[in-house]
Amino acid sequence: KEMHPNTLKCIEYGAKVVEVPYGYLTVVEKHAKDYCLLTGAKKLVFGAKTMENKILIGNRMRQVIQQLGKEPEEIWCAIGSGTLVDSILLATETAKIYGVQVGAEYTGKHERLTVLKYPKSFDKLSKFVADFPSMPNYDLKAFELCIKHKQSNDVLFWNVL
């Protein structure tokens, strides 16, 4: 089986990749927990969803806003675990945030947040064409809905790739 380009990039940067048979997230999580018990490694929570990580991502959002000179009217991103959208909400005051749920169900609520569910499952790829690199099962789905549903032209799209 050919490795995903992101996996190859992780290996290039020194990551040790242990592949397991794919399946439900609970099965993959069990493999990860067993590996950590066996090796003493530390397992990150799904989406690295810690307050420390949210603060780091939020700080990056503030840097982007500073570079833009103002908060955009709309910020769009994909939602997997919810870490990114939670971080954006922490770092902004006025922007309307649009999160496109592409995988796990996101249950967070905020007055400035609108969550749109992508109509196809995580494993189904978006066929939308963007003029920048984007993951077709993740960010590209959010960009597709951003282009279709944005309410203004003052939009920031956060592409994780």
Explain the meaning of each model-derived region.
Residues 94-150:
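Active-site/ligand-binding loops adjacent to catalytic centers
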